[in-house]
Design a protein with these regions (language model features):
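Intrinsically disordered, compositionally biased charged tails
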Residues: 1-19, 26, 86, 183, ...
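Flexible, glycine/charged-enriched surface loops at secondary-structure junctions
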Residues: 39-43, 200-212
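Flexible glycine-/small-residue-rich
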Residues: 47-49, 80, 119, 176-178, ...
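Residue-level signature of catalytic and energy-coupling elements of molecular machines
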Residues: 27, 88, 133, 215
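Long, charge-patterned amphipathic alpha-helical coiled-coil/hairpin "stalk" segments used as oligomerization
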Residues: 94-197
Length: 229
């Protein structure tokens, strides 16, 4: 941490006088007040779930459609048959192809954020698993990225569909907007994430599924949010 950042961060820490929970509205207001950098900082949340991982235990991995997106541009590639190239092009995909795209990925040319594949092309994805898997780019039916409906998949990804997944300690983090977003848009996105997570609660989990929730900005400090019952 450089001196300039360290001095700024210490000043921000001085503003956090206690560890009391905040209402979502108050927490957003304080996070925004602390956004003193010149760029449009991301507004991020981190959640602690009642889902610590052990071998062969279920992992929460799903997608949530943020009503207002998160302010980040997503570059989408579509792997499809030659007969569907025009459909992929018209869908708004940034990259599209069949064998040529496979060859590009094999050679390490991965200049996209999300990859959509038609079902029939998945049989050719085997050799790409070792390349795409570690990067979290492997198409997955559960996440809506293996589908015959190319137009819908690309539209969803472009309009704010994001993947959420917990780590081995039960923590989950995602971006829900930018400083420039109105409070109402951030709140709407936050509620969409919370609603989706509650729907994914495993039947064997007793008690609260979300143990704690924090909100912060790219260069700011975090505030604990009091979740509504």
């Amino acid at each position: 941490m450089n001196k300039k950042k360290s001095k700024r961060y210490k000043k921000l820490l001085d503003l956090v006088k206690n560890k009391n929970t905040e209402s979502l509205e108050d927490a957003i207001n304080k996070v925004k007040q602390n956004c003193t950098t010149k760029f449009d900082e991301s507004i991020d949340i981190s959640l602690s779930l009642n889902l610590k991982q052990k071998k062969e235990e279920i992992t929460l991995r799903t997608v949530v459609k943020l009503p207002n997106g998160n302010g980040k541009k997503v570059k989408v590639a579509v792997l499809c048959e030659d007969t569907k190239i025009n459909e992929a092009k018209e869908s708004g995909a940034d990259l599209y192809g069949s064998e040529i795209l496979i060859n590009d990925i094999t050679s390490g040319k991965i200049n996209f954020d999300k990859l959509v594949s038609t079902p029939s092309m998945m049989s050719k994805m085997g050799k790409l698993g070792k390349i795409l898997g570690p990067k979290g780019l492997m198409p997955n039916p559960k996440l809506g990225t293996v589908t015959a409906d190319i137009k819908k998949a690309v539209k969803d990804l472009k309009e704010g569909q994001v993947e959420i997944k917990n780590d081995k300690d039960g923590n989950l983090a995602t971006s829900i907007g930018k400083k420039s977003f109105t409070d109402a848009k951030i709140i709407e996105n936050f509620n969409a994430v919370i609603k989706t997570i509650h729907k994914e609660k495993p039947s064997g989990i007793k008690g609260d599924f979300i143990l704690s929730s924090f909100i912060t900005s790219t260069m700011g400090v975090s505030y604990k949010i009091k979740l509504k019952a």
